[in-house]
Amino acid sequence: MKIKLEIKRLPHGANLPFPSYASEGAAGMDVVSAEDVILQPMQRYPVKTGFAVAIPNGYEIQVRARSGLALKHGIACPNAPGTIDSDYRGEVKILLINLGSEAFEIKRGDRIAQLILASVTQAVFCEVTDLDDTQRGHNGFGSTGI
């Protein structure tokens, strides 16, 4: 299934590619940086992309790390997956963190993350006095094994 998204190029996004799929079966669109940044070890930074997007109601865009950057350099999205809500109209920024031991240079035009369009189901809470019993019950963190 394909859904059209309206995208607005911002002035500092001139001559940069819009997010795109690297292969026919790719789930995520590669997104590039619109600025030069040097991320020091353990530094977090919201990297500009040079575009804004109108996401249809009932959808979100999830922001995920690129596996190669994570494996080779420790570059990750600290709140992965990040969420861009359908009513947000500002510049898309990619929050990155350098978990590596060396500074990492991002150049304008470098692929920095993946964007995934996903449908959203909103919950409606209904307060009750008791919840149904399950085998797991109140057992939480680590209760089902390592």
Swiss-Prot record:
Family: Belongs to the dUTPase family.
Lineage: Bacteria, Pseudomonadati, Pseudomonadota, Alphaproteobacteria, Sphingomonadales
Gene encoding the protein: dut
Keywords: Hydrolase, Magnesium, Metal-binding, Nucleotide metabolism
Statement: the UniProt record of this protein carries the keyword Magnesium: yes
Reaction(s) catalysed (UniProt annotation): dUTP + H2O = dUMP + diphosphate + H(+)
InterPro entries: dUTPase, dUTPase-like, dUTPase-like_sf, dUTPase_trimeric
The keyword Ribonucleoprotein belongs to this UniProt entry's keyword annotation: no
Organism (species): Zymomonas mobilis subsp. mobilis (strain ATCC 31821 / ZM4 / CP4)
Enzyme class: hydrolase
Any single biological process term in GO: dUTP catabolic process
HAMAP family cross-referenced by the UniProt entry: dUTPase_bact (MF_00116)
Cofactors named for this entry: Mg(2+)
Annotated binding of substrate, by residue: R66, S67, G68, N79, T83, I84, D85, K93
EC number(s) from the headed UniProt entry: 3.6.1.23
Entry-linked CDD domains: trimeric_dUTPase
Highest taxon above the source species: Bacteria
Its biological purpose: This enzyme is involved in nucleotide metabolism: it produces dUMP, the immediate precursor of thymidine nucleotides and it decreases the intracellular concentration of dUTP so that uracil cannot be incorporated into DNA.
PANTHER family linked to this entry: DEOXYURIDINE 5'-TRIPHOSPHATE NUCLEOTIDOHYDROLASE (PTHR11241:SF0)
Name of protein: Deoxyuridine 5'-triphosphate nucleotidohydrolase
